[in-house]
């Protein structure tokens, strides 16, 4: 089953009418993944025996019988969950993450776990124990990261929807690089229980699909309260599909100078064209400033690395995960297991975080970073007092070549300069396809105030209806 021209509504109609059975859909999906993944390497685990739930009611749940991909840092009962790390190469969870339980209740079919940067730390899906994932638009390019496997699986027509996680842009940047829609909800909108932790104050599970409405359908299911996660909001979840097809007349759209100045040439023209489309439809365009954007990258890497160094202390070779052989004593077990189990990028982040949290550095680095984070939040609050959404480029460039930046951490980190601030502020943000630059997709980022994902869906759906990017086929998947 190839999903390049399918969406959740079209599949639901075929399933409900009997034109297609959920069993056949699952089998055909797995077969197509195995065939096309020879090009992409988007999957770590493919479930050969993937089966739909019994007694599916297609009239009550749009997700009934729909195959969905899961990023491999989201816990799945009885299905190997590795976070793309040698440290967890044999980890078999005994419970489901809350989002998985909710999707099962809705009747979704799970077909496997997607590739990613190890422990979600990366921007290219090259930092994976299972090898790099390839971009469906050009197999020599990266798919972005860390949710690159999920993005490539959707863009390559392997599935119609996938879950990802976003700590500093890990849903939006791959969505932009692969020409799909990806949304990071408000921090606290979706339960993080069962998400393998990277940066606990930044992490958020989100959705990646080819069509905007499909993400709304999935977010309807996974959003909402959870007794296992004290940070998740218990506020009522609106029906996000109600924002699809709405008019944007009168929508107040802020365009940050700092974001537009970060791009030039053809890329700026593509982004500006989408902004002009909103203006032509009656949206009110306001140029604004987010002055602390220039501090976002160093601020993020101090906070995220500090939280990561704490979260990753649990991987010691004792309770679970990789355990080194030929060790002499307990300390040797710790040192060798972590040295051999973690990849280079993980060790780099642990060292950075441990330094920032050390007694002699805490006040100079982590405490100062927390203050800068507050200033970034204040910037957004001021803008949203007079605007409904903020739009601009998702990334500063289209997808780069595999191997081009993997050995240059500073250059790799700067890929996140336009996405990081939304995580620091905890606001919802998404990327919707804007067009092509040199044959590769670029995305328009849309941000809104906390818990106003509806404005994002309204804006993104309008852009999608206008440019119809979903009609394009990734050139790397053409026979």
Swiss-Prot record:
<protein>
    <recommendedName>
        <fullName>Glutamyl-tRNA(Gln) amidotransferase subunit A</fullName>
        <ecNumber>6.3.5.7</ecNumber>
    </recommendedName>
</protein>
<comment type="subunit">
    <text>Heterotrimer of A, B and C subunits.</text>
</comment>
<dbReference type="Pfam" id="PF01425">
    <property type="entry name" value="Amidase"/>
</dbReference>
<comment type="function">
    <text>Allows the formation of correctly charged Gln-tRNA(Gln) through the transamidation of misacylated Glu-tRNA(Gln) in organisms which lack glutaminyl-tRNA synthetase. The reaction takes place in the presence of glutamine and ATP through an activated gamma-phospho-Glu-tRNA(Gln).</text>
</comment>
<dbReference type="InterPro" id="IPR023631">
    <property type="entry name" value="Amidase_dom"/>
</dbReference>
<dbReference type="GO" id="GO:0030956">
    <property type="term" value="C:glutamyl-tRNA(Gln) amidotransferase complex"/>
</dbReference>
<dbReference type="InterPro" id="IPR004412">
    <property type="entry name" value="GatA"/>
</dbReference>
<dbReference type="GO" id="GO:0050567">
    <property type="term" value="F:glutaminyl-tRNA synthase (glutamine-hydrolyzing) activity"/>
</dbReference>
<feature type="active site" description="Acyl-ester intermediate">
    <location>
        <position position="170"/>
    </location>
</feature>
<feature type="active site" description="Charge relay system">
    <location>
        <position position="71"/>
    </location>
</feature>
<feature type="active site" description="Charge relay system">
    <location>
        <position position="146"/>
    </location>
</feature>
<keyword id="KW-0547">Nucleotide-binding</keyword>
<dbReference type="InterPro" id="IPR036928">
    <property type="entry name" value="AS_sf"/>
</dbReference>
<dbReference type="GO" id="GO:0005524">
    <property type="term" value="F:ATP binding"/>
</dbReference>
<dbReference type="GO" id="GO:0006412">
    <property type="term" value="P:translation"/>
</dbReference>
<dbReference type="InterPro" id="IPR000120">
    <property type="entry name" value="Amidase"/>
</dbReference>
<keyword id="KW-0436">Ligase</keyword>
<comment type="similarity">
    <text>Belongs to the amidase family. GatA subfamily.</text>
</comment>
<keyword id="KW-0648">Protein biosynthesis</keyword>
<keyword id="KW-0067">ATP-binding</keyword>
<dbReference type="InterPro" id="IPR020556">
    <property type="entry name" value="Amidase_CS"/>
</dbReference>
């Amino acid at each position: 089953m190839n999903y390049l021209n399918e969406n959740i509504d079209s599949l639901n109609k075929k399933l409900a009418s009997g034109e297609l059975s959920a069993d056949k859909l699952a089998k055909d999906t797995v077969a197509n993944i195995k065939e096309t993944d020879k090009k992409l390497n988007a999957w770590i685990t493919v479930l050969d025996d993937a089966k739909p739930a019994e007694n599916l009611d297609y009239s009550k749940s749009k997700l009934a019988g729909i195959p969905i991909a899961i990023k491999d840092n989201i816990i799945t009962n009885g299905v190997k969950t590795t976070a793309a790390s040698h440290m967890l190469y044999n980890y078999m969870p005994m419970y489901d993450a809350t989002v998985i339980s909710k999707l099962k209740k809705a009747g979704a079919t799970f077909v496997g776990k997607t590739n990613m940067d190890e422990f979600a730390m990366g921007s290219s899906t090259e930092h994976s124990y299972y090898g790099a994932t390839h971009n469906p638009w050009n197999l020599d390019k990266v798919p972005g990261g860390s949710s690159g496997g999920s993005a490539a699986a959707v863009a390559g027509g392997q599935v119609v929807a996938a879950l990802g996680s976003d700590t500093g842009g890990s849903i939006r940047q791959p969505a932009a690089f692969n020409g799909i829609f990806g949304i990071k909800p408000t921090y606290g909108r979706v339960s993080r229980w069962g998400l393998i932790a990277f940066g606990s104050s930044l992490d958020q599970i989100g959705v990646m699909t080819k069509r905007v409405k499909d993400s709304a359908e999935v977010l309807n299911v996974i959003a909402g309260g959870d007794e296992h996660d004290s940070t998740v909001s218990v506020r009522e979840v609106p029906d996000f599909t109600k924002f699809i097809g709405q008019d944007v007349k009168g929508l107040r759209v802020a365009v940050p100078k700092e974001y537009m100045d970060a791009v030039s040439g053809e890329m700026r023209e593509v982004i500006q064209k989408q902004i002009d489309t909103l203006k032509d439809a009656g949206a009110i365009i306001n140029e604004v400033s987010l002055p602390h954007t220039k501090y976002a990258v160093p601020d993020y890497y101090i906070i995220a690395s500090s939280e990561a160094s704490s979260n990753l202390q649990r991987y010691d070779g004792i309770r679970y995960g990789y355990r080194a052989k030929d060790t002499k004593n307990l300390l040797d077990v710790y040192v060798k297991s972590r040295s051999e189990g973690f990849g280079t990028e993980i060790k780099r982040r642990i060292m950075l975080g441990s330094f920032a949290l050390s007694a002699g550095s805490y006040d100079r680095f982590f405490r100062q970073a927390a203050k800068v984070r507050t200033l970034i939040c204040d910037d957004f609050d001021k803008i949203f007092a007079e605007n409904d959404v903020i739009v601009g480029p998702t990334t500063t460039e289209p997808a780069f070549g595999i191997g081009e930046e993997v050995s240059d951490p500073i250059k790799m980190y700067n890929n996140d300069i336009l996405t990081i601030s939304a995580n620091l502020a905890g606001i919802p943000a998404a990327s919707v396809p804007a067009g092509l630059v040199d044959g590769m997709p670029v995305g328009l980022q849309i941000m809104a105030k906390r818990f106003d994902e509806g404005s994002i869906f309204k804006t993104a759906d309008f852009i999608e209806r206008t440019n119809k990017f979903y009609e394009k086929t990734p050139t790397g998947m053409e026979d």
